[in-house]
Amino acid sequence: MVKMYYEADVKQEVLRGKTIAIIGYGSQGHAQAQNLRDSGYKVVVGLRPGKSWDVAAKDGFEVLTVAEATKRADVVQILMPDERQAQVYRDEIAPNLKSGAALCFSHGFNIHYAQIVPPADVDVIMAAPKSPGHLVRRVYQEGFGVPGLIAIYQDATGNAKDLALAYSSGIGCTKAGVIETSFREETETDLFGEQAVLCGGASELVKAGFDTLVEAGYAPEIAYFECLHELKLIVDLMYEGGLARMRYSISDTAEYGDYSTGRRIITDETRKEMKKVLAEIQDGTFARNWILENQANRPGFTSRRRLESEHGIEVVGEQLRGMMSWINKDTKKEEVKIGQ
């Protein structure tokens, strides 16, 4: 069984009086910075000039260059996109990192795949909320917290675990519960979930269902509702109570179709391919390909993004979502928060 930690396990004094630098002010950056400040910790934000600088300043933070924020900080939480972290670390963080400080991450990609190699005299920890930033912030403001993960990669001071727990408490996670993991486990399972299920798997399944109905002569609008729009209804039920809650809530006809058809779609061959995907994550193949793609200025990524945006489901979806005022309102409200 995994080890769970809660508020009673936290030694907040290990973080009191320290300066925390949040590097990046996107989805997680804005939420973690504000939660930590509201928990009574001293927070500065390290950024390069741009939109996020103005947003962080408007939110009342002292905004510094990444180099200056690192010089000032006892804890440096790197919350920039994975593909930008290594260069920013080499150019601006590493030369200014204090001995005995802590490097903190919310995803282990750059540590696990050695794109960031920290010096031996700093702690390297993870504090990873298992929710998007806007939810991390909203739930904290309601007096609660979202679940999270902690991991220790390097314990130079002997206080790394206590520091990870105190940081997690500062952003609200120990109110819900924090699971101890490793940088390897978090990185590999996170990438697999994204690729095989949440993003790659789900998007291809949705498109395949949409295409099947449209090619059979059904209206694209109806296909969109059946294969994409209603997915949220099902996922929300799973989120609230697992597969059992979902199956309890749907009709018996839908439940019978689940049992009789599901394994015809996700076949043994699909499961074998999932194992190949996991192996490519474990042996570094995916990481190498993604790093090289970025070094080449993302030609394949950019091309695929354009092609996907032209798929029929996007065309009809844009029209139908225009009828849904609540979606447009919610999207606009979070637009600033999720931009990097």
From Swiss-Prot:
Organism, as annotated: Brevibacillus brevis (strain 47 / JCM 6285 / NBRC 100599)
Family membership: Belongs to the ketol-acid reductoisomerase family.
Cofactor(s) this protein cannot do without: Mg(2+)
PROSITE patterns found in the cross-reference section: KARI_C (PS51851), KARI_N (PS51850)
Residues that bind Mg(2+) 1: 190, 194
UniProt function note: Involved in the biosynthesis of branched-chain amino acids (BCAA). Catalyzes an alkyl-migration followed by a ketol-acid reduction of (S)-2-acetolactate (S2AL) to yield (R)-2,3-dihydroxy-isovalerate. In the isomerase reaction, S2AL is rearranged via a Mg-dependent methyl migration to produce 3-hydroxy-3-methyl-2-ketobutyrate (HMKB). In the reductase reaction, this 2-ketoacid undergoes a metal-dependent reduction by NADPH to yield (R)-2,3-dihydroxy-isovalerate.
Record: residues binding NADP(+): 25-28, 48, 52, 82-85, 133
PANTHER family: KETOL-ACID REDUCTOISOMERASE, MITOCHONDRIAL
Residues covered by the KARI N-terminal Rossmann domain: 2-181
Name of the protein described by the UniProt record: Ketol-acid reductoisomerase (NADP(+))
Binding site for Mg(2+) 2: 190, 226, 230
GO BP terms: isoleucine biosynthetic process; L-valine biosynthetic process
The record's free-text note on cofactor binding: Binds 2 magnesium ions per subunit.
Binding site for substrate: 251
